Amino acid sequence: MSSNQQPVVLGKLGSCHGIKGWLKITAYTDSVEGIFDYSPWLIKENGEWREVKVIQWRYQGKAVVAELEGVTTRERAQMLTNCEIGILPEQMNALPEDEFYWRDLIGCEVINTNGYNMGVVDQIVETGSNDVLLVKANAKDSFGKVERMLPFVPGQFILKVDIQGKQILVDWDPDF
């Protein structure tokens, strides 16, 4: 892996399952089995990312467990508990033009239709009805805001997203 590529974190390894090195998997993907659509995985062990292959996986009650290449004992599996699971950015599926990965929206500057810089997207929250951008306001915000919450509703509040330019144009009152 080249040093300038930051892996996309998709989950983490949980506790051991059994004596043969299987591990529980916590997936951050939409569906828990979605994490297995990607191969190979990168595992962050002792601060270093390394490639690992999933040999097999299965449901175990309400959990999902996996057997990883080179992990054949409970002791070795215990060493991997809580390690992050990632993939290279180019392994991500291409999206239609009007869809975006959250990771690409975080760090974007948010500008309203009057040209007011509302701040930078710090987080995104899934609410059920629509995603919400948590925008960290600039230090000298004219409206005294520290953070703004903007619904991510394209065509209504979100007018344009420029991932390359790291900018989002919104129809939103900065006083909200």
Curated annotation (Swiss-Prot):
Provide the assembly information: Binds ribosomal protein uS19.
The UniProt keywords, alphabetically, are:
Chaperone, Cytoplasm, Ribosome biogenesis, rRNA processing
What InterPro entries does its record include? PRC-brl_dom, PRC_barrel-like_sf, RimM, RimM_N, RimM_N_sf, Transl_B-barrel_sf
Name this protein carries in UniProt = Ribosome maturation factor RimM
What this chain does, per the record? An accessory protein needed during the final step in the assembly of 30S ribosomal subunit, possibly for assembly of the head region. Essential for efficient processing of 16S rRNA. May be needed both before and after RbfA during the maturation of 16S rRNA. It has affinity for free ribosomal 30S subunits but not for 70S ribosomes.
What Gene Ontology molecular function terms does this protein carry? ribosome binding
Residue span, PRC barrel domain: 97-176
Which HAMAP family does the record associate with it? Ribosome_mat_RimM
State where the protein is found.
Cytoplasm
Under the heading Gene3D superfamilies, the entry gives: PRC-barrel domain, RimM
- Biological process (GO) annotations? ribosomal small subunit biogenesis; rRNA processing
Family that this chain belongs to: Belongs to the RimM family.
Keyword Chaperone recorded: yes
| Gene that specifies this protein | rimM
